[in-house]
């Protein structure tokens, strides 16, 4: 990026300046005020109070001053470095804290983290956890198959014959419009009592199972009642499973009929709108019910497909896409005389969330025109499936065709591409109400091992876009025991409130024989699932021995993370899994791509890499060294990794002496414990303790004062070696309490902070202690009480020297308006401890600078004052250099941190901008610093962000969702007997039932969490120091408006010292660099699919079985017209029944949530 050059009208007195380093203009600067070297330099702060008493120099005129020479500014930089270093040496207490640790060497041991042993142990623990769930799954699946095989079908079964707990009963009883209220309460409905269980985050009943039946399925049908009858026997198996493994969470059987039976019983979490949950559309069910798919969807957009039929097709395609998972590949094309893709994707792409979003948006743009050309559509689809040069599922291959009907059977196309092996299944969908002969569509499906469906109206879409899974399940069922393999899902949001979970799935087969010929049944009964909460897996990983910047992560075969500290979705969608790629969870580079590939391949490995990491507050980038170690988790598709910085190879473990442990008194009686009591804060400083799980009975609280109170109360009852407490955490906390108290005693208490313009001094430790001195400074302490979650703590560990952290500009008040409050800048540094040959960083210490006072001191330190208090004399006959104090109207002097945020300025009007990105303060100068490589930037995407919902468009004149007849239609007798009339009535019927499919509930839009925020992508930009380390002079070239500037890194800090001429005119304004997070559509998906990330599909595939019976290949799904209903609706319309609000097809996907 080049610095933009512009010519301005203003003139500049003096010589023309060029864009090159210069020896300086005017006289040399004052002699080095440090004098001869006579010992270590003292902090200049000791000299500042008398300097501040001197009268300010009066500028004798612009002609008397020149821009400072380079070595003058280097001298100022050295003064700043010495001042910072001197203050930190006196108050930071780094050396003193080292001595304190060594003096207390008998109170702790140094333990080593051995990456290979650690990762193998954790992988083994996770394997054991999941294996227990696998055994429970197998018991359930075997029992279900046996129960169903022994069940005798009952044609005359009635609702009152079946007793079960309807999970939605409580919600339906509260809803006067519910199905049960309309038909009256049933004696078959059990009423249960529930108890709160924190493991389920819900009220549960351990004696019963609960049943959930989708709203669009009649629970009194013979099929459903028989299903309820035989699945009741699963209750005892669920209970026995829990007896054998009390850690089991939800055990679920999802039936192919749509019935869900789960244990333990709990009321269904039904939304305020209509409940459209269907287990068959859940990610875990889809994965368990069939093998991966390569699917091409072709949509007839000929001229006959228009209005309602086209809208039904668009909705159907979107629903079909929702039945696909990340193991599947898909493309969508429209056809008339020619076929073309609806989106920018020219080949099969992975059916992930972002790709499906592209398809769904593109489908809405389809327009009907031309004539029907089945041949073009099918040839395009077969060519897509035969393309072997792309990544794909390489398992089930299928074509899904949506049309309103036609006569052509395109037999020649099938003969060319698919016969005789018939490796591609063809599913045909007749959409809308029409009078076309459907025989050709049925023939296409039946001769290509597929199925024919009818979608006459909106109510038939959901069921008919998911039942193809039954056909795909046939080879799996016929494979028998070979297909009985447990699969583990991606991470997704549990529908019953557990949070993020993974689910182990196992298909359940129908073992009955069909008819007297003893032909084997080939239908899948359903899928058995057992949930495992991510929190339960996290508990198996080491939390605090890895240090603040060490962590464990796990990924699956798609490269999606199962565990990762950055897996923190702010919103979740029940319909989609949570898919965060490892390369999106971290900042991507080539080394991480290699690690990811090796993990997906199931290899072991270790690699030390230099990489970039984003700070916890997402404002900074650090270049760090990390050690990655990884192993596969056996019997699963997961791989586990461990990340350690070199300084976390060792950690401290408190070793409270036998004498202390032998005193069987509460912990509160220990000597060091008294320094946790609030009564000691006034003299010893305020103590924040990390809200960790020290003991099982400790009540958590977001308020640290409340948490400390709970902790102290519990410690009154607990001995140091109590079995209910985590001794490692508890002992380390007490150890660090005593060590930080000694820092107060040896260093802080005897120092006068006000003399050095300090608001506070502090220390934070790995053991979870943050001590802030003096006590009153705690009132303005805003850092996280958990050091591992505090940005200053983690950044200090990763960097050498002093790390400045200005306050975030959103929380900053104008200093001149401050009354009793003051604004501070944190300066922190890690304490590196060497014990023998072992080095570690167990703590971070620092100070909090008074911003207003230090802004004044900054000006003096960057001035031409001498130690002899002799200001430089300038007059008409002599020249001297400008400085940051006297010439602040002409000279801009700033300290900027490594993220580009303003820390200090010599401009009083900029004090309220401290903490802002410098481009917002001086865009021209920041761009020059970037162009001259003082800064570089990193752009990335946050795929887990939450955004406010977009205001709905065209509310006043939304397009109609259904055909509305005109007066002429009502007067035309032929119209009343046409298919169009019946289609309208069917739409109205379904509109009465499924109104929420088309139109969002106004009440929900006002207050529901689902409508307040939605998942979105945010683009993030962070800046960090570039390759320039030396002192550097440059010019911002803008003709007569050009500006000179000097920039230099301050040694042992994260600061850049910049001195520049203030801009003379505004015409030189350049483009502004942006740092603020912005809403984005993410990277261009059309480009990303051309270079897909490496992945592997499941190891098993069941797409063919020679014994498969394909004769069952199609049926209509519309219900026959009822003369009574038809006549009634006609009368109501003729009598002027007020119309319901028109349903909006375009909001169908947005207004319902599974």
Swiss-Prot record:
Tissue spec: Predominantly expressed in brain in a restricted pattern. Also expressed at lower level in kidney and testis Not expressed in lung at any moment of development. In brain, it localizes to sections of P21 brain. Expressed at high level in the cerebellum, with moderate levels in medulla, pons, and striatum. Also expressed in cortex, hippocampus, habenula and nucleus reticularis thalami (nRT). Strongly expressed in cerebellar Purkinje cells.
Extracellular compartment residues: 19-1116
A GO biological-process term: calcium ion transport
Stretches of the chain forming a coiled coil according to its record: none
Domain VWFA: residue ranges: 294-472
Highest taxon of the lineage: Eukaryota
Binding-site residues, a divalent metal cation: 300, 302, 304
Cellular component terms (Gene Ontology): GABA-ergic synapse; plasma membrane; presynaptic active zone membrane; voltage-gated calcium channel complex
Residues exposed to the Cytoplasmic side: 1138-1154
Signal peptide start and end residues: 1-18
Record bears the keyword Ion transport: yes
Disulfide linkage: 446-1101
Glycan-linked positions: 205, 389, 421, 510, 543, 627, 864
Membrane topology: Single-pass type I membrane protein
Ranges annotated as biased composition (Pro residues): 24-34
Transmembrane helix is among the record's keywords: yes
Chain ranges of the Cache domain: 488-577
Subunit record text: Dimer formed of alpha-2-2 and delta-2 chains; disulfide-linked. Voltage-dependent calcium channels are multisubunit complexes, consisting of alpha-1 (CACNA1), alpha-2 (CACNA2D), beta (CACNB) and delta (CACNA2D) subunits in a 1:1:1:1 ratio.
Disease implicated: Defects in Cacna2d2 are the cause of ducky phenotype (du). Du mice have spike-wave seizures characteristic of absence epilepsy and ataxia, with accompanying decreased calcium channel current in cerebellar Purkinje cells.
Domain description: The MIDAS-like motif in the VWFA domain binds divalent metal cations and is required to promote trafficking of the alpha-1 (CACNA1) subunit to the plasma membrane by an integrin-like switch.
UniProt protein name: Voltage-dependent calcium channel subunit alpha-2/delta-2
Species in which this protein is naturally found: Mus musculus
Gene: Cacna2d2
């Amino acid at each position: 990026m080049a610095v933009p050059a512009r010519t301005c009208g203003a003139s500049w007195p003096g010589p023309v300046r060029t864009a090159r380093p210069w020896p300086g203009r005017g006289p040399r600067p004052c002699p080095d005020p440090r004098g001869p070297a006579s010992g270590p330099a003292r902090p200049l702060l000791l000299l500042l109070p008398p300097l501040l008493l001197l009268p300010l120099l009066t500028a004798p005129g612009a002609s008397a001053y020149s821009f400072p020479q380079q070595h003058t500014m280097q001298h100022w930089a050295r003064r700043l470095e010495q001042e910072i270093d001197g203050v930190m040496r006196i108050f930071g207490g780094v050396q003193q804290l080292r001595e304190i640790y060594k003096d207390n060497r008998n109170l702790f041991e140094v333990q080593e983290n051995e990456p290979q042993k650690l990762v193998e142990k954790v992988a083994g623990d996770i394997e054991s956890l999941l294996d227990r769930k696998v055994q429970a799954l197998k018991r359930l699946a075997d029992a279900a198959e046996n129960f169903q095989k022994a069940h005798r079908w009952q044609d005359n079964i009635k609702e009152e014959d079946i007793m079960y707990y309807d999970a939605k009963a409580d919600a339906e009883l509260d809803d006067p419009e519910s199905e049960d209220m309309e038909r009256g309460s049933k004696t078959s409905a059990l009423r249960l009592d529930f108890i709160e269980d924190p493991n389920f985050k819900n009220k549960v009943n351990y004696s019963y199972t609960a049943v959930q039946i989708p709203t669009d399925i009649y629970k009194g049908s013979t099929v459903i009642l028989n299903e309820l009858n035989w699945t009741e026997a699963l209750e005892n198996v669920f209970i026995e499973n829990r007896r054998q493994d009390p850690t089991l969470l939800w055990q679920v059987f999802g039936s192919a009929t749509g019935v869900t039976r789960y244990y333990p019983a709990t009321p269904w979490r039904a939304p305020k709108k209509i409940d459209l949950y269907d287990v068959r559309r859940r990610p875990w069910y889809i994965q368990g019910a069939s093998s991966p798919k390569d699917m091409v969807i072709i949509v007839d957009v000929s001229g006959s497909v228009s209005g309602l039929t086209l809208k039904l097709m668009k909705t159907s395609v979107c629903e079909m896409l929702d039945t696909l998972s990340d193991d599947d590949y898909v493309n969508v094309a429209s056809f008339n005389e020619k076929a073309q893709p609806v989106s920018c994707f020219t080949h099969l792409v992975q059916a992930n969330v972002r790709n499906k979003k592209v398809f769904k948006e593109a489908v809405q743009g389809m327009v009907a025109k031309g004539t029907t050309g089945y041949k073009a559509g099918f040839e395009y689809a077969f060519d897509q499936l035969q393309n072997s040069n792309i990544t794909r599922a390489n398992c089930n291959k299928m074509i899904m065709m949506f049309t309103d009907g036609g006569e052509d059977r395109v037999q020649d196309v099938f003969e060319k591409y698919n016969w005789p092996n018939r490796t591609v299944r063809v599913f045909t969908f007749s959409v809308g109400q029409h009078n076309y002969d459907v025989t050709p569509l049925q023939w296409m499906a039946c001769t290509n091992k597929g199925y024919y469906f009818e979608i006459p109206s909106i109510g038939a879409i959901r069921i008919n876009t998911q039942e193809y899974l039954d056909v795909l399940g046939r080879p799996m069922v016929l494979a028998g025991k070979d297909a009985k393999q447990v699969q583990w899902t991606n991470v997704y949001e549990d529908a019953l409130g557990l949070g993020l979970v993974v689910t182990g799935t196992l298909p359940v087969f129908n073992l009955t024989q069909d008819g007297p010929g003893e032909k084997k049944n080939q239908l899948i009964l359903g899928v058995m699932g057992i949930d495992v909460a991510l929190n339960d897996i996290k508990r198996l990983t080491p939390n605090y021995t890895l240090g603040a910047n060490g962590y464990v992560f796990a990924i699956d075969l798609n490269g999606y993370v199962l565990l990762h500290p950055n897996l923190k979705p702010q919103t979740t969608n029940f319909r989609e899994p949570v898919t965060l790629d490892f390369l999106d969870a971290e900042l991507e580079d080539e080394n991480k791509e290699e690690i990811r590939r090796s993990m997906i391949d199931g290899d072991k490995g270790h690699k030390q890499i230099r990489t970039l990491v984003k700070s916890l507050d997402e404002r900074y980038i650090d270049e760090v060294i990390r050690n990655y170690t990884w192993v596969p988790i056996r019997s699963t598709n997961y791989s586990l990794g461990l990340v350690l910085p070199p300084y976390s190879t060792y950690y401290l473990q408190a070793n409270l002496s036998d004498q202390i442990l032998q005193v069987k008194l509460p912990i509160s009686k220990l000597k060091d414990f008294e320094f946790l009591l609030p009564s000691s804060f006034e003299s010893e400083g305020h103590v924040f303790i990390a809200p960790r799980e020290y003991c099982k009975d400790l009540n958590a609280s977001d308020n640290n004062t409340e948490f400390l109170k709970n902790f102290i109360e519990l410690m009154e009852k607990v001995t140091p070696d109590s079995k209910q407490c985590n001794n490692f955490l508890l002992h380390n906390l007490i150890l660090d309490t005593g060590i930080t108290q000694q820092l107060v005693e040896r260093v802080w208490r005897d120092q006068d902070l006000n003399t050095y313009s300090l608001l506070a001094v502090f220390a934070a430790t790995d053991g979870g202690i943050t001590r802030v001195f003096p006590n009153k400074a705690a009132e303005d302490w805003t850092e996280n009480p958990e050091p591992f979650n505090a940005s200053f703590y983690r950044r200090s560990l990763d960097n050498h020297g002093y790390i400045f952290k200005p306050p975030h500009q959103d929380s900053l008040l104008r200093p001149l308006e401050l009354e009793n409050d003051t604004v501070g800048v944190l300066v922190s540094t890690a304490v590196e401890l060497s014990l023998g040959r072992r080095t570690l960083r167990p703590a971070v210490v620092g100070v909090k600078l008074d911003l207003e006072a230090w802004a004044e001191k900054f000006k003096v330190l960057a001035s031409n004052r001498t130690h002899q208090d002799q200001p430089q004399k300038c007059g008409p006959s002599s020249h001297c250099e400008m400085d940051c104090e006297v010439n602040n109207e002409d000279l801009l002097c700033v300290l900027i941190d490594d993220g580009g945020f303003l820390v200090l300025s010599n401009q009083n009007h900029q004090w309220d901008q401290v903490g802002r990105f410098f481009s917002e303060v001086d865009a021209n100068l920041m761009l020059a610093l970037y162009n001259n490589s003082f800064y570089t930037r990193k752009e990335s995407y946050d795929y887990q962000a939450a955004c406010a919902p977009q205001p709905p468009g065209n509310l006043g004149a939304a397009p109609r969702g259904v055909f509305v007849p005109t007066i002429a239609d009502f007067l035309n007798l032929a119209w009343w007997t046409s298919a169009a009339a019946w289609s309208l009535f069917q739409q109205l019927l379904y509109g009465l039932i499924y109104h929420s499919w088309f139109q969002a509930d106004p009440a929900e839009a006002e207050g529901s969490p689902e409508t307040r925020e939605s998942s979105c992508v945010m683009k993030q930009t962070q800046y960090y120091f570039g390759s320039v380390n030396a002192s550097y002079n440059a010019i911002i070239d803008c003709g007569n408006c050009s500006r000179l500037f000097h920039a230099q890194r301050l040694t042992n800090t994260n600061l850049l010292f910049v001195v520049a001429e203030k801009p003379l005119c505004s015409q030189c304004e350049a483009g502004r660099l942006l740092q603020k997070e912005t809403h984005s559509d993410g990277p261009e998906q059309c480009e990303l699919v051309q270079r897909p990330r490496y992945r592997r599909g499941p190891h098993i595939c069941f797409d063919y079985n020679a014994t498969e019976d394909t004769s069952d290949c199609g049926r209509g799904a519309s219900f026959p017209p009822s003369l009574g209903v038809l006549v009634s609706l006609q009368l109501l319309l003729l009598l002027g029944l007020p119309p319901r609000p028109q349903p909006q097809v375009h909001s169908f996907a947005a207004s319902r949530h599974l």
